[in-house]
């Protein structure tokens, strides 16, 4: 079944870089990233990174593909030049109509308000210390596995409901 094939696109960004670490790479071939591949260095052009990534991904997937977009950031948007919140909200809403699922994970901000401003219902907060960051990734991984387990048995519009709920970590 085509829904059993999983691909990863991973983008690291800051105010000076937009780095596609993985672009539609088979999930089984994606390996842990290194510190050299991901070195945050200030500035969070979150809207620009989201707008560019969603637009690029939209051009590469089929309308019947299940797409899960997870945004992880340690700070508020503060450096975008091409997209604003309204444009991202419209883009997210358009893609949700095509059964894309969005999750937002953030630190050092009002995560619920930021996610809501972009029309993202599934959100998770973490603290930027080693223990909480590791716990956030454990929880996200557990939720992702639960999501993958539902892909073939749950209608696409229901996949986005309660992404971070009911998971034992």
Residue ranges and their predicted role:
Residues 2-169:
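Acidic, low-complexity intrinsically disordered regions
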